[in-house]
Amino acid sequence: MEIMDEIKVNLQKEVSLEEAERYAKNIASKYGDGILLSVHDSKTGYRAPEVYCCGEKPWEVYACNRGANLKISVNQFEFYFRIEVEGQAKY
């Protein structure tokens, strides 16, 4: 798996998936145009897309195989983005 930038945000309050996603998208937008590829909630086990494969973290494998280059963690939520700058992948 390729190495990607990782940003961790620990809010001192509980947030919903929707709130955490807004935080993550706001942060990602500062790096360039991005697309959210996958998400995982370590507390409930929720993941999107709901893929099963590889014996590893399938949501991470899915995102990496589609060019993820930025992981943003907000509390227990993990968001994987592919960031592009001026039409090219960041890396």
Swiss-Prot record:
This is Uncharacterized protein AF_1514. It comes from the Archaea. InterPro entries: DUF5619 (IPR041145). Pfam families: DUF5619.
